[in-house]
């Protein structure tokens, strides 16, 4: 039940840390979905009177209740975490001027949503994310930058963690699970951030030491092995279908 000394689990987390070029990783079936992973990462690294700011506009609908944009029991707002937001410019770029203006002493975490989600704005490239992280770190190097990497894994040859993100967060039932992982999520990042995330996911003092894999660890490894091929096929299919329908006069994304 405890899952102590699970070599398969611990090795998988080393593999994720190696792939994402981070100090540590938390990859668990106990993380039920992407929203759960994001909620864990945020609540682990924010304290009362700290401020969270999203600089890619309003996040996914499901995160609104996590943050407290929409009132919800147990939200970050209920625990005294402040929230601010900077929308993207009309052309889809980051609003550097507004971001600089809103970097206040109480700002602890900056969130970036890589995917367009349910909006029609452009998805953010790793290059663009890297530029804004560099800009932020030059102003205040202690700010934690968390990137919601859902739907973005293995789409490019590098990940947000390669360009300065302190945490990258996602779901195994999306890209990195390769269509095989039945549940799970991951958080990759600095040793300090991941330790806090592990204590939040399980309990203080236990952290990464507990968490049985319940016999599904094989699907996590196999899914990760297949993930780049599955993602490439999905991208090719999307581009092909978009061009097919564009040829018949439909407005499409990607165009």
Residues covered by each model-derived region:
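Short loop-beta-helix segment that forms the pyridoxal 5′-phosphate
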Residues: 17-41
């Amino acid at each position: 039940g405890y899952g102590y000394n699970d070599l398969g689990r611990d090795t998988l987390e080393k593999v994720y840390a190696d792939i994402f070029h981070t100090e540590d990783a938390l990859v668990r079936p106990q993380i039920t979905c992407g929203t759960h992973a994001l909620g864990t990462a945020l609540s682990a690294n924010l304290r009362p009177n700290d401020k969270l700011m999203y600089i890619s506009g309003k996040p996914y609908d499901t995160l609104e209740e996590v943050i407290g944009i929409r009132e919800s029991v147990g939200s970050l707002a209920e625990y005294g975490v402040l929230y601010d937001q900077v929308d993207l410019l009309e052309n889809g770029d980051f609003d550097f001027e507004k971001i600089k203006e809103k970097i206040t002493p109480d700002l602890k975490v900056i969130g970036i949503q890589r995917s367009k989600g349910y909006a029609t704005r452009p998805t953010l490239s790793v290059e663009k994310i890297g530029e804004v992280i560099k800009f932020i770190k030059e102003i205040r190097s202690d700010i934690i930058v968390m990137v919601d990497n859902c739907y973005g894994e293995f789409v490019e040859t590098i990940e947000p963690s390669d360009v300065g993100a302190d945490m990258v967060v996602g779901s195994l039932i999306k890209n990195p699970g390769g269509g095989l992982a039945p549940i799970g999520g991951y958080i990759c990042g600095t040793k300090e951030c991941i330790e806090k995330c592990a204590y939040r996911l399980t309990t203080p003092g236990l952290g990464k030491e507990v968490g049985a894999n319940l016999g599904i660890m094989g699907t996590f490894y196999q899914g990760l092995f297949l993930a780049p091929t599955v993602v490439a096929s999905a991208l090719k299919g999307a581009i092909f279908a978009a061009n097919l329908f564009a040829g018949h006069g439909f407005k499409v994304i990607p165009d």
